[in-house]
């Protein structure tokens, strides 16, 4: 409203989470999607072409969900600031991983600046109920200033019931998830999160190494943290159908989200997976052998359908 933008737009990569499109639909915003490059981060040249006088928000992901790589946040924030737009960093998956990863293994697991230390970043989201290890229903959004935060609040005093103020779409919510999240964070502390992050990324590193050692499948891009995908290796003489691999793993009790394009199996690795990792790695090898001779598998939906 302050810039008098009549038809506001969100500029985001095709790798940005689908929830942004849901939000745009709810609020009547237009989305302008830009492609990713060969390393699966946003194409900055295409994003520069997409931002303009109607841009209200530019999105960066730290990391993006499908391939698990971190967008160049500083460059994205600079593009947003150049047109007077906000820049939101989706760190729902990385907010409780990236800070501790940089402490544990700065060379191997570190990331370029992505948080509010980056000039031009105006807000960050981080999910406590993911790698914060809190129960479902707890997340945070951090605004750079109180001035920006006030736009989130709905304030109405034009009915007979008195003033109604709410900072979210859901209205009144249970305090239980917040209390549980507070308890988890207090219990784990810095040392606890460092230990959990080391376990999660250590397991993910073993998975990446094992997948890339099997002819016919690979891990795309250079994900350094706990998210990754498994895809068919099209450079192989015998590429494996990745959904057939998913079927073979499912038959052994391992169920993975299926995504695309490109067709892939998505893995979110947490510290809790470490105890079964050895068994999973053995089954991966057996499933790959089975998938070579199998008919193509089928995709599923990342959603809840009626």
State where each predicted segment sits.
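PLP-dependent aspartate aminotransferase-fold enzymes
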Residues: 1-57, 77-78
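Active-site pre-lysine segment of PLP-dependent enzymes
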Residues: 44-46, 70-82, 94-123
């Amino acid at each position: 409203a302050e810039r008098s933008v009549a038809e506001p737009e969100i500029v985001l990569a095709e790798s940005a989470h689908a929830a942004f499109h849901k939000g745009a639909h709810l609020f009547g915003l237009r989305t302008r999607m830009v492609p990713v490059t060969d390393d699966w981060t946003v194409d900055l040249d295409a994003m520069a072409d997409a931002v303009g006088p109607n841009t209200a928000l530019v999105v960066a992901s730290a990391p993006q969900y499908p391939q698990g790589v971190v967008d160049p946040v500083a460059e994205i924030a600079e593009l947003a600031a150049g047109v007077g737009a906000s820049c939101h960093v989706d760190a729902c998956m990385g907010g409780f991983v990236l800070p501790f990863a940089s402490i544990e293994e700065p060379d191997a697991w570190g990331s370029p600046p992505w948080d509010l230390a980056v000039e031009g970043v105006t807000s960050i989201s981080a999910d406590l109920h993911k790698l914060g290890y809190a129960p479902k229903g707890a997340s945070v959004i951090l605004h750079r200033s109180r001035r920006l935060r006030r736009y989130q609040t709905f304030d109405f005093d034009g009915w007979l019931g008195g003033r109604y103020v709410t900072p979210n779409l859901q209205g009144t919510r249970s305090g239980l998830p917040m209390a549980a999240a507070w308890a988890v964070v207090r219990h784990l502390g810095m040392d606890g999160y460092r230990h959990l992050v080391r376990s999660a990324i250590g397991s993910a590193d073993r998975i990446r190494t094992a997948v890339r050692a099997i002819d016919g499948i690979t891990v795309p891009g250079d994900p350094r943290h706990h998210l990754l995908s498994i895809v068919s290796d099209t450079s192989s003489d015998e590429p494996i159908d990745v959904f057939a691999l998913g079927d073979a793993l499912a038959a052994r009790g391992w169920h993975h989200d299926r995504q695309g394009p490109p067709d892939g199996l998505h893995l979110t690795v947490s510290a809790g997976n470490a105890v079964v990792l050895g068994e999973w790695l053995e089954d991966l090898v057996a499933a790959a052998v089975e998938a070579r001779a199998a008919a193509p598998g089928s995709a599923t939906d990342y959603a809840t359908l009626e």
